[in-house]
């Protein structure tokens, strides 16, 4: 074995050990262990013996062809499974150490914020400001605190000059930022993106990823 190859192997080994050390220092947030799910209307599982652990601070991309189970994993994480989409599960699935399959949609929304592929499917308010404030209104946050929080989050995603606009007046990139603000407003633990760049041009996509 050449000296260069030995160095490469040592570097790889050290990087793996460092990653394992960092994992031990952080807490797992999402844990799938031998997890399987089969929709009621299907004859075989969409997810079969999935093992996946995501730790605090990690950014994970799930990639695969159509029908490979990407959306099913997302539905498990945001609570649509088993609350909306029914089926049979086996194995364990935890969020922040708790059995995630026992959470209702409201409980799950306290931990997970979802940004959909098509922002138009997610808008609720008549204006950008109302849409960002929607979750705070449901939590009965005092009005002044709500106004300050909406302004702060809108500045973070660079839509603070559009708070009085209708969401449907915005460009694709601006719409995506508004939906992101709507989930950031509650200081949630997990951000879940369902193909957030699918409808964006390269420049808008890069800006969204930076946020």
Language-model-derived ranges and their functions:
Residues 92-107:
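ABC ATPase NBD Q-loop/coupling interface
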Residues 144-162:
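Conserved ABC ATPase "signature" region
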Residues 180:
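Hydrophobic anchor residue at the start of the ABC signature
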Residues 187:
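Conserved catalytic motifs of ABC-family nucleotide-binding domains
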């Amino acid at each position: 074995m050449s000296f260069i190859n030995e160095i490469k192997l040592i570097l790889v080994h050290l990087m793996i050990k460092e990653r394992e050390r960092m994992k031990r220092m952080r807490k797992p947030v999402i844990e799938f262990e031998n997890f399987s799910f089969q929709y009621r209307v299907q004859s075989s599982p969409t997810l079969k013996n999935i093992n996946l652990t995501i730790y605090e601070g990690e950014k994970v991309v799930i990639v695969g062809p159509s029908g490979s189970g990407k959306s099913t994993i997302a539905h498990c994480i945001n609570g649509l499974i088993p609350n909306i989409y029914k089926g049979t599960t086996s194995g364990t699935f935890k969020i922040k150490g708790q059995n995630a399959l026992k959470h209702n949609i409201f409980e799950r929304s306290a931990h997970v914020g979802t940004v959909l592929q098509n922002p138009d499917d997610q808008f609720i308010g008549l204006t950008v400001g109302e849409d960002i404030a929607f979750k705070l209104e449901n939590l009965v946050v005092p009005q002044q605190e709500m106004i300050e929080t909406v302004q702060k989050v809108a500045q973070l995603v660079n839509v603070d000059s559009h708070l009085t606009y209708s969401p449907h007046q915005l460009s694709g990139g601006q719409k995506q930022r508004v939906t992101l603000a709507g989930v950031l407003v509650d200081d949630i633990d997990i951000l879940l993106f369902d193909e957030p760049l699918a409808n964006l041009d390269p420049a808008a996509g890069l800006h969204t990823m930076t946020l």
